Amino acid sequence: MHVKAKTVALGGLLLALTIVFMALGSVIETSTLFLLAAASFFVGIVIREFGLAAGGAFYLAAVLLGFFVAPNKFYVLTFAAMGFYILGIEAVWRWLSKRHGMQKRHLIFWIAKYVVFNIVYIPIVILFRDMLFAQAVSDTMLLVVIAGGQIGLFVYDRAYDYVQAHIWGKMRGRFL
């Protein structure tokens, strides 16, 4: 298999930026989620430019390299969850794009987004309850946190769509 030089160069550049954003999340504590979200958006850029296999390899490389380089390993796990979501929705999008006869593909895509997110989010909130919260949390409060996550997903997903369509759409020609 031959890999084009541009693919390797851009992939390496985006991987370096991903790791820098993960590390900066530890330095600039007030912008941690923003920086981790931005780092995870690079997974989507690689998938859209070079395919799902390259995106999966990029994601795996970013997580492994993040564990070696990033000072806060919890932020690497957060990035891993965000990147997994991007990987999952891009895989669903590619699968749905091949199903032209399927009705309501947009609705199915939105449902799939929430399914992929909740496959990761709900077990983390329930299993790591003591680690995530400073004190004991009631079941009602846990449901509020889960509902808040759904709102957070909506904002994160809208930001991802904006970055892909507008920001990367304008910068794409300069890199490729």
Question: Which positions does each model-derived feature cover?
Answer:
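Alpha-helical transmembrane segments of multipass membrane proteins
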Residues: 18-22, 66, 85, 113-121, ...
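Hydrophobic transmembrane alpha-helices
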Residues: 1-54
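Alpha-helical transmembrane segments and their cytosolic interface
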Residues: 4, 140-176
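Interfacial aromatic-anchored transmembrane helix boundaries in multi-pass membrane proteins
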Residues: 23-32, 63-91
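Short helix-perturbing small/polar motifs within transmembrane alpha-helices
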Residues: 79-122, 126
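Membrane-interface helix termini and inter-helical loops of multi-pass transporters
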Residues: 127-140
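Membrane-helix interface segments
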Residues: 52-57, 99-107, 138, 142
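Hydrophobic alpha-helical transmembrane segments
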Residues: 8-13, 34, 56-60, 76, ...
